[in-house]
Amino acid sequence: MGCASSAEERAAPSAQQADREKLKEDGIQAAKDIKLLLLGAGESGKSTIVKQMKIIHESGFTNEDFKQYRPVVYSNTIQSLVAILRAMPTLGITYANKDRESDGKMVFDVIQRMEDTEPFSEELLAAMKRLWADAGVQECFGRSNEYQLNDSAKYFLDDLDRLGARDYQPTEEDILRTRVKTTGIVEVHFSFKNLNFKLFDVGRGQRSERKKWIHCFEDVTAIIFCVAMSEYDQVLHEDETTNRMQESLKLFDSICNNKWFTDTSIILFLNKKDLFEEKIRKSPLTICFPEYTRAYQEYGEAAAYIRSQFEAKNNSTTKEIYCHMTATDTNNNQFVFDAVTDVIIANNLRGCGLY
């Protein structure tokens, strides 16, 4: 009996050690499974990030993807031009050359016939080029913060000859610039730094609807919240009395201080910094923030002020907001995501008691 008891006593510590090792292994494995929730107001750059993750961490776009995005490029381009033409009468702007009226009618007819996803005919391409070169159209484009216009409009309209070529095939950059409204939940899986990522883009989601599903994501590792810096002087599509950045601030407040995300890391992506840097020279930040009193609209100071406004929404003394400024440039976002991943690894291991 004494020998048996002694053997049991000796076995107990080793069993406990095995349990500890098993718990540690499970913790390490759990720390390797990363769920990221992508949130932000409409047109804040969420879909672009999903596409960039596909380029960086998967095999990029397939031949079928390139084929499917071709009509999207055509539609985005002509719809952007139409948005400018429609805004001209509202803003009291006329064509510099009256001959452009017939060109405008041709473009409107294409939309009326729902042929905006078709390749441009030679006549249509020539009309679009003449319209884009018209001084009146350019004046209206310069006031695009006063109406709704895709921020990729200039990118595509400046390159009409390439888009209008008979053998045109979209580039990766073209696909990144396209705008397709996200419906439902988009899920992307990829591996990076020995981690297994699941990235969820839940689209726009009305505030009233958000309450119904937000708790389903309480176990996410981190939230990436996207803000379009360049939209500080624009209003919402659905409510043209509400400033887009002010709406983003409200949404960020509701997410950052949500009871479901008390222990969730929050990464703030201030997107479209390239467009913001260009716009801040001519459109004052006071449109969104009247209290911003700098006489000279300098990019660095203005960007820092926007960042401070979002960070000030954090009511927690223990939660840290990890902020990064990003552009449409994939190389820039690869560097940013690399830094973000290091933060996620450290926080996840710490949460499992392994760091």
UniProtKB/Swiss-Prot annotation:
BP terms from Gene Ontology: adenylate cyclase-modulating G protein-coupled receptor signaling pathway
Lipidation feature positions (S-palmitoyl cysteine): C3
Sequence segments annotated as region (G2 motif): 174-182
Pfam family, one: G-alpha
Ranges where the record places region G1 motif: 35-48
Biased composition regions of type Low complexity, renumbered to the chain: 1-17
Residues of the signal peptide: none
Binding site for GTP: 40-47, 176-182, 201-206, 271-274, 327
Chain positions covered by the region annotation G4 motif: 267-274
Lipid moiety-binding region (N-myristoyl glycine): G2
Residue segments, region Disordered: 1-24
Region: G3 motif, residue numbers: 197-206
Stated family: Belongs to the G-alpha family. G(i/o/t/z) subfamily.
Assembly and oligomerization: G proteins are composed of 3 units; alpha, beta and gamma. The alpha chain contains the guanine nucleotide binding site.
Protein name, per record: Guanine nucleotide-binding protein G(o) subunit alpha
Species the sequence originates in: Manduca sexta
